[in-house]
Amino acid sequence: MGWLCPGLTFSVSCLILVWAAGSGVTCVSPGGVRVLEWPICLSDYVSTSTCEWRMAGPVNCSAEFRLSYQLKFFNTENHTTCVPENRAGSVCVCHMLMESIVIVDTYQLDLWAGEQLLWNSSFKPSQNVKPLAPRNLMVHANISHTWLLTWSNPYPSESYLYSELTYLVNISNENDPTDFRIYNVTYLGPTLRFPANTLKSGAAYSARVKAWAQRYNSTWSEWSPSVKWLNYYEEPLEQRLPLGVSISCVVILIICLSCYFGIIRIKKEWWDQIPNPAHSPLVAIVIQDSQVSLWGKRSRGQEPAKCPRWKTCLTKLLPCFLEHGVDRDEDSSKAARNGPSQGPAKAAWRPVEVSKTILWPESISVVRCVELFEAQVENEEEEEEEDKGSFCPSPENSGGSFQEGREGIAARLTESLFLDLLGDESGAFSPQGMGQSCLLPPLENASAPMPWAEFPRVGSPEASSQGKEQPLNPEPSPQATPTQSLASLAFPELPAVIADNPAYRSFSTFLSQSSDPGELDSDPELAEALEEVEPSLPAAPQPSEPPPTLQPEPETWEQILRQSVLQRRAAPAPASGPSSSGYREFVHAVEQGTQDRRAAGSGPCGEAGYKAFSSLLAGSASCPGTSGLEPSSGESGYKPFQSLPPGCPETPVPTPLFTFGLDMEPPPSPQNPPFPGSSAECPGLEPAVKGEDGQKPPLALEQAADPLRDDLGSGIVYSALTCHLCGHLKQCHGQEDGGKVHVVASPCCSCCCEDGSPPMVTPLRAPDAPSSGVPLEASLSPASLALLGVSREGKIPPCLQITPSNVQSSSQTPTAVAMLSPGPACMDTS
C-alpha cells in the first residue's frame, strides 16, 4: 500500500483530539498551544452573542484562532468569521453579531487554528441567554428618612426580555466589607426603597444591580456600575436611650464620689472638732473581771465581727439601702444564738431616719456598770446593832467580798419578807425597819391584878440569892395552911426602855437591852403591885424563912422554857445594867412594848397576834361581874381573841393565824376533874376548901407533871396556843363527871368547845383531890412544887395564898384548890 496523504492524516488526528476533548483531553494546535476549555457561547437575545474559551497559556488569540458561525436555515452557505480578542491574559473572546434573533434560530460554530479545525458545535441563542446589565443606577434621599435606588431596563420595550427580567441589588459599606445588604427586586419596576436607619449613620455606602431572566433559564447579568452616598440621619429616642443612660450613670457616679469626699472632708475639718462627751476620758470605766456579771460577757464566738471600712462608708453614704440589711443580719445572728423565739424567721423592719444616719458620728462603745456599795453607818445605834448580830454585814466583816455583800442583802430581804408575811397574816405587825421583829404589848392596865406567881430564874445564883433576901410581904391569914398558900399577885408593867415603835423589834435590840434578873424589883410599879392584895382574899402569913426551892431538871423543852420564864418573872430586879444573858424572854419584851405603846398614847392594840396568859388575866379583871359562869373541864381563863365577850369595849381583836401546831394540850386524867366552883366578884384565884388533910402521899411524877405543864404552859407567850383551823385553844378533854356541861370536840380538829363557843383555858388547873382529902401539895410532884415555890415543909409564897371562901361542906375533907373565874376576860390589846 502506499503512503496516506498528509491531509487525511491531519483530519484523523483532529477527530481523535475532539473525541479526547469530549473525554477530557485537550486539543493541541499545530503551534503547540493547548486549549483548556472549549468555547462557551451566550446571547443577550438582542443582537450579539459572545463566545469565549480559556487557553493553557498566553496566546495571541487574534493571530492564532478563527471562529466561524453560520445560521442553519434552508441550507444557506453564508459563513461569517469572528476574530477573537484577548481578555484577562489567556481568555479569548469573540463577539458574534446576529440580526433579529428569534427563538427558533440555530447556528453552527467552528473554531479554526490556522488551517486546523479545533472545535465545532451548534448554538441556539434562545437557550443560552445572558441579560444585559442595568443602566443608569441612581440613589435619591427621601423626606421620610428612606433611600430610593433607581435604574433603567437595558432592553427596549419591544424586546422579549423587557418584561421578563428580575433584579438583584447589593448595598455595601465602603469601609466595612462585611456590612452589606442584598435586596431582590421581583416586581417590574426598576426601583428600590429602603430606610436609612437600617444602615449606619455617617457611613459611606455603594449600591449596584444586576438582572436575570428566569423564563429563559438565563444566567445573571454583569453588575451595573455602582453608585455611592453618605448615610446620615437623626437617630430616634430609643436608639439614643442607651447612650443617655450610660452618660447619666457616669454623671451620678461622679456626683456620689464628690459628695462622699466632700462629707469626709467636712467631717474631718468641722464635725470632729465639735466637743463630744463620748470622747471624754471620764466616760471610760475600767471594770475588773470580778465585778462584771457573767451573763454580761460575750464569748468570742458571739462577739460581732467588725464591719469593714468600705461597708461603713457605704452605710454613711447610702443608709436607706444598707441599714435594713445590717438590721436583718443582726436579727438573724441573734435568732441563731437564742433559738426560734418569735415563730417564723422574719426580721423586724424599722424605718431609718436618714437625716440622723448620714451625719451621725461613729459610735463609741461605753461600758455601763452598776456597782453596789455598803451604806455608811450614820449614828452609833446602827453601828452597835451591826456589832451585836445584825443581819447587815459590815464591810470589815464581809472582807470586801462582793459575794458576801449580796448574801447579806439577801438575808435582809428574806427577813423583811418574813416579817411582812407575819404582819399580813396576823394583822399585828407593822414593818418599820430591817432586821426587827414585831412584838406587841399584852397589857392595857398597869394596875390590873395578875393572879400568877413569879419564880426565880433557873440556874441563876443571883436570882436565888435575891429571892432569899427580898421575900414577899403578904397579909397574914389565920385560916392559911400550907396547901392554901396560892394567892393572887398583880403583875405590873415595866418602864419604857426603847423609844421607837415597840411593835417591831429585832433580836439584837433585846440583846443590847436585856436586863438582869433583878430588874423587876427595881420598878416602883412592880413594888406597888406586890403590895396590892384583893380585899376579898385574906393574905397568908409570911413565913420566917424563905422556903428552899426544889429545881429538878426538866424533861422536855417546854418545861425548860416555862420554868425559865416563870423564874425570870419572879426574880427581883436590881438596877438596870448591861445584860450578860443571851436573848431576852419574849414576855419581858412584850411588857416593855406595852409601856411604850401606852406612853405614846396609842389606841387599843389590835396588832398583837398573841398574848401572854398573865395579860389575859389582867384583861379579865377589867370587866367585873362577868365571871359568873360555871367552868367546865375545857374552860379556863385564857381564851382566843374571837371568843372575847361583846360587852367589853376593847373586844375586837384580830385572830392569830400562826400556831405552828405546838399548842396541843393533853387531856387531863379522868381521876382529876377540875372543880366547878368560882367566884363572880373578881377574877383571880379562888380556893375551894375540902379538907385539911395534908398527909396524903403525892402523886407520881408523870401524873403531876402533866397538869402542871398544861397549867403553867398558858403563862408563856408564843404563837402555838391557838388552833389554826377553828381558832380555839387546842385542848383535848374527857367528858365531865356528875352531869356537868359536856365539852365536845370541833369537827375540824381535836379542840374542845362548849356549844360552839371558844373554850377557855385554866392557867392553874389543879387536879381533883381524892375523896380522902389529899392536899394540893401532896398531889404535885417535887418538880411542880419547886416551880410553884412551895417547899416540902408546906410553905408557899404569900403571892399564891388562897382564901377559904368556897368551902362546900364540913363533912367533906377540905382541900384547897386554886381556880380561875371562868367569866369573860376583857382586856386592852394595845
Swiss-Prot record:
Amino acid composition bias (Polar residues), ranges on this chain: 623-635
Residue numbers of Phosphoserine PTMs: 172
Post-translational modification: On IL4 binding, phosphorylated on C-terminal tyrosine residues.
Signal peptide: 1-32
Keyword Glycoprotein tagged: yes
Gene Ontology terms: biological process: cytokine-mediated signaling pathway; production of molecular mediator involved in inflammatory response
Pro residues biased stretches: 538-551, 646-655, 665-676
Region ranges (Required for IRS1 activation and IL4-induced cell growth): 444-564
CDD domains: FN3 (cd00063)
GO (cellular component) term, any one: external side of plasma membrane
Membrane topology value: Single-pass type I membrane protein
Broad class of where this protein is predominantly found: membrane
Extracellular side: 33-240
Domain comment, as recorded: The WSXWS motif appears to be necessary for proper protein folding and thereby efficient intracellular transport and cell-surface receptor binding.
Name of this chain's protein: Interleukin-4 receptor subunit alpha
